[in-house]
From Swiss-Prot:
Residues of the Helicase ATP-binding domain: 377-582
Role summary: ATP-dependent RNA helicase involved in mRNA splicing. May destabilize the U1/5'-splice site duplex to permit an effective competition for the 5'-splice site by the U6 snRNA, resulting in the switch between U1 and U6 at the 5'-splice site. May also act to unwind the U4/U6 base-pairing interaction in the U4/U6/U5 snRNP, facilitating the first covalent step of splicing.
The protein's assembly and partners: Component of the U5 snRNP complex.
Source organism (scientific name): Emericella nidulans (strain FGSC A4 / ATCC 38163 / CBS 112.46 / NRRL 194 / M139)
Protein name as it appears in the record: Pre-mRNA-splicing ATP-dependent RNA helicase prp28
Gene3D superfamilies in UniProt: P-loop containing nucleotide triphosphate hydrolases
């Protein structure tokens, strides 16, 4: 073994012209030529003399390597061209050689199959005992097996070494360090991609894209399924069986019938059965037949009563069910709270009002009740205390006037005895402004004069002597503002000894104007003998109506408002007993019939120019109302409007009562085109057929804005409200944007939507504006 390891390799064969044998398929391909290795010596030269043995030098990373001479480009191109030409030439192989190669290949396949099937004697699968042992190699490439020959000849199936061992690849396992680096880089990239996918799913949610495709061809699973159903034309039983040709009809006793048939079939069956009874027995059978037909008629009516496909407007009142009432309330946006609240009325005939009062309603022209009238009148007719929350212009005046007239109609006439005149009215109606009080008086006289009742209004701007003269004959109903009514009580012009009906209209506006203390004084002046108990008995309509026709009837209190601030709730808790709460829509919202438009215009001159363009466009017919915030601006804008060729009047707190009434009368009768006013005209003033409301200055609060635009679109008619907005209105921009969003027919302009002040609700009390006018007493007020 020692001698074999030092022998040089055998010399090449002498016959260089003979073709080399074909390479075996199982042999590994030769390695690429090593460009750093020196070329082999030519064959015709004699072998070089043996070189003296030189001691090996230590090779390391710091050792300087000898410079190698690179090959020329022309030499490489020439070699490549020769190799390509040799590969392109066909190689001739004899038949015997081809058969030999085929037999060798087949023998190797059989041998490999035999080794895989039977295994080796030692139990090691896949090892050839005839070949030299390859041994086990560590990751560093070192062999741990027993050497069987020279290092250069251990791997017999490998290529012959062509250079020093230090310049050859030691990794024989097929995986190089560069491959390991590539795999490691790919693993790191896969891990980074997986982490990025998890982060994307965490913050952006799972992928909602569906991979479903309707065009994708699906495998049909019912092709070979046997069909157990037969078509009608495949039935052959009727050809030979007479039973199928003459089918027997099932006859039921009495009203029995097959399911799935309509009432017409049941009616015909009942008539047929009744006729059979009459034919069998003329006397008793005819009576029984009539009873059966009557039973069938009642059954048909009962089924019609419980039908769900009929609308509530097509049903009778006794046929209405809880589901129908729920749909009815949703249609009119009615919400009620409180115990024992009656159902709304669908028409005036179901209101429970006296016949004489219904005739007056028809004469005045109230065809269909409004939502607040549908819900509030049945509750008020049961002597219940009531809080009505409804949008402006919804018919609240008639909602409390009609039950009031029905209430006092049961009481003795006030002019029957002299002492009754001196005990004061039966009912008082409180309103925040003089104009609203006079408007309620006009509406009330439409019903009270035919019934013989006396109505008197007590408001500021008129002398006390004139109002005392109006009260000389007594009055069943007094309509007043809180301030003037307190003055009359303190001057002993009026007492409330027999007052049993109290109505507060626009209660939230009265609180805003500082009338909370006068309202408390008025309510404290009422008698306590007829006050309702604060128990469940206050919800019992029969108990509250027990003393009909006498003086001792329980007091009934009603409050109507558009919003519910804290002060209004405080008054309601103190003076109302177990009230029923009726809400139409949402508190504080504008009516859906008003189209709200907002224009961002800064500066008085630009707003005046835009106002002139709107009035001159001819798109809106008079009357038109223009609202401003400051009283001195009313006259200036009115002069501008007159210069444009339109007639105009002003309405504000510096006007006398006669001037206010004359201005409203000129607008109502059509002699004036434009009314320029402050918030004095923004609450409760009813000017018919107002087509346009212009807010020259935005209101200081969203509640005032709501009642300003409520002057148009009243009684179900449509209207338009245009508001000029500036940066000084930042406190109300957020609420204004929310109101425009809720309106189905309005649009939020982009300037308002993107404005900084409209993004969040302002803090309470920050930048709150103070209204200039502060009351209604004399010229100093509105």
């Amino acid at each position: 073994m020692e001698s074999q390891s030092i022998l040089p390799p055998p010399p090449p064969p002498e016959d260089a012209s003979a073709p080399p044998p074909p390479p075996e398929e199982s042999a590994a391909p030769p390695p690429p030529p090593d460009v750093s290795a020196p070329p082999p010596p030519p064959e015709d030269l004699p072998p070089p003399p043996p070189e003296p043995e030189v001691k090996k030098k230590k090779v390391g990373w710091g050792t300087k390597r000898p410079a190698t001479t690179p090959l020329s480009v022309e030499e490489l191109v020439r070699k490549k061209r020769e190799a390509d030409a040799a590969a392109a030439r066909p190689k001739f192989m004899s038949k015997a050689e081809r058969e030999r190669l085929a037999l060798e290949k087949r023998a190797k396949e059989v041998d490999a199959q035999r080794r895989r099937t039977n295994g080796t004697p030692n139990g090691v699968d896949g090892m050839d005992l005839d070949t030299p042992s390859r041994g086990f190699r560590t990751p560093n490439g070192d062999s741990r097996s027993i050497p069987t020959g020279p290092r250069a000849m251990r791997n017999g199936d490998g290529p012959t070494p062509t250079g020093p061992a230090a310049m050859r690849s030691r990794n024989d396992s097929g995986t190089t360090k560069s491959d390991k680096k590539v795999d490691k880089r790919f693993n790191e990239e896969d891990e980074a991609a997986a982490q990025a996918a998890l982060i994307k799913q965490r913050y952006m949610g799972a992928d909602q894209t569906s991979n479903f495709s309707a065009k994708k061809k699906r495998k049909r699973t019912t092709d070979r399924k046997f069909n157990f159903e037969w078509n009608a034309e495949e039935d052959t039983s009727g050809d030979y069986n007479p039973l199928y040709q003459h089918r027997h009809e099932a006859n039921f006793f009495g009203r029995g019938r097959l399911a799935g048939f309509g009432d017409d079939v049941a009616d015909s069956v009942a008539k047929k059965y009744a006729k059979a009874l009459e034919d069998r027995d003329r006397e008793a059978g005819s009576i029984r037949a009539r009873e059966i037909l009557e039973m069938e008629r009642r059954r048909r009516e009962e089924s019609t009563r419980n039908q769900l496909d009929k609308h509530w407007s097509e049903k009778k009142l006794e046929h209405m069910r809880e589901r129908d009432w729920r749909i009815f309330k949703e249609d009119f946006n009615i919400a009620t709270k409180g115990g024992s609240v009656p159902n709304p009325m669908r028409s005036w005939d179901e209101s429970g009002l006296p016949k004489r009062l219904l005739e007056l309603v028809d004469r005045v022209g109230y065809k269909e009740p409004t939502p607040i009238q549908r819900a509030a009148i049945p509750i008020a007719m049961q002597s219940r205390d009531l809080i009505g929350v409804a949008v402006t212009g919804s018919g609240k005046t008639a909602a409390f006037l009609l039950p009031l007239l029905c209430y006092i109609a049961e009481l003795p006439r006030i002019d029957e005895f002299e002492w009754r005149k001196n005990d004061g009215p039966y009912a008082i109606v409180l309103a925040p402004t003089r104009e609203l009080a006079q408007q309620i008086e006009i509406e009330a006289k439409k019903f009270t004069e035919p019934l013989g009742f006396n109505v008197v209004s007590i408001v500021g701007g008129h002398s006390f002597e004139e109002q005392a003269y109006s009260l000389r004959n007594g009055a069943e109903i007094i309509i007043a503002t809180p301030g003037r009514l307190v003055d009359c009580i303190e001057r002993r012009m009026l007492v409330l000894s027999q007052c049993c009906y109290v109505i507060m209209d626009e209660a939230d506006r009265m609180i805003d104007l500082g009338f909370e203390e006068p309202v408390n004084k008025i309510l404290d002046a009422l008698p306590v003998t007829n006050e309702k108990p604060d128990t469940e008995e206050a919800e019992d309509s029969s108990a509250m109506s027990r003393h009909l026709g006498s003086k001792d009837r329980y007091r009934q209190t009603m409050m109507y408002t558009a919003t519910m601030p804290t002060a209004v709730e405080r008054i309601a808790r103190k003076y109302l007993r177990r009230p029923a709460i009726v809400t139409i829509g949402s508190a504080g919202e504008a009516v859906d019939t008003v189209e709200q438009r907002v224009e961002m215009i800064a500066g008085e001159d630009k707003r005046k120019k835009r106002l002139g363009e709107i009035l001159s466009s001819g798109d809106f017919r008079p009357p038109i109302i223009v609202f401003v915030n400051i009283k001195r601006n009313c006259d200036a804008i009115a002069r501008e409007i007159k210069q444009w060729g339109f007639s105009s009047v002003t309405l504000h707190g510096s006007k006398t009562q006669e001037q206010r009434e004359a201005a409203l009368a000129s607008v109502r009768n059509g002699s004036t085109d434009v009314l320029v006013a402050t918030d004095l005209a923004g609450r409760g003033i009813d000017v018919p057929d107002v087509s346009l409301v212009i807010n020259f200055n935005m209101a200081t609060s969203i509640e005032s804005y709501t009642h300003r635009i409520g002057r148009t679109g009243r009684a179900g008619k449509s209207g338009v409200a245009i508001t000029f907005l500036g940066n000084e209105d930042a406190d109300v921009m957020y609420d204004l944007k929310q109101m425009l969003i809720k309106s189905p027919i309005s649009r939020v302009p982009e300037e308002l939507r993107k404005h900084e002040a409209a993004q969040s609700k302002p803090t309470r009390g920050a930048g709150k504006k103070i209204e200039e006018a502060s009351g209604f007493a004399g010229k100093g007020g509105w």
